[in-house]
Regions:
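Compositionally biased, charged N-terminal/linker segments
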Residues: 1-46, 117-124, 128-131
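Short beta-strand or tight-loop elements
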Residues: 46-48, 63
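Aromatic- and Lys/Arg-enriched surface recognition patch
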Residues: 60-131
Length: 131
């Protein structure tokens, strides 16, 4: 299954670009295995993908990660009590960094939080990521 996952990182880089996109690319290349926070439990499984979209300054899908297993409970943050481990794909994230998918091209133009990728959008995401 494929999921859209919102990240809200730094708004803009000094050159007007997205520092969030750069940060995601750096993470993919240096520390790709991460724990991602969830506000609710989702029926995720090993092999599912997180398509990570940056909320600002532009709304676009800029990275992809493969989920390692089901979400698990994590103490410490009552607003986001769940975590899921996923590994960013350096090659696919690099391709998305260079040619991101703007949300206005997707059927779900206003995703809220973590939602499933619509079937109509998957081919575009896979193509842009080189998968």
């Amino acid at each position: 299954m494929d999921w859209l996952f919102i990240v809200k990182l730094a708004a803009a880089a000094p050159d007007g670009g997205s520092s969030a996109k750069r940060h995601l690319l750096e993470l993919a290349e240096t520390e790709p295995r991460r724990e991602w926070c969830l506000s609710r439990w989702r029926r995720m499984a090993a092999g599912d993908r997180l398509w990570i979209y940056v909320a600002s300054p532009v709304r676009e899908v800029a990275a992809v990660a493969e989920i390692e297993g089901e979400p698990f409970e994590a103490a410490g943050n009552p607003r986001q009590p769940w975590r899921v481990r996923a590994t960013l794909s350096p090659a696919a994230t690099r391709r998305l960094h260079n040619d991101p998918v703007p949300l206005h091209l997707l059927a779900n133009r206003h995703p809220q939080g973590v939602t499933r990728v619509k079937d109509a959008d998957l081919a575009l995401l896979l193509r842009r990521a080189g998968l």
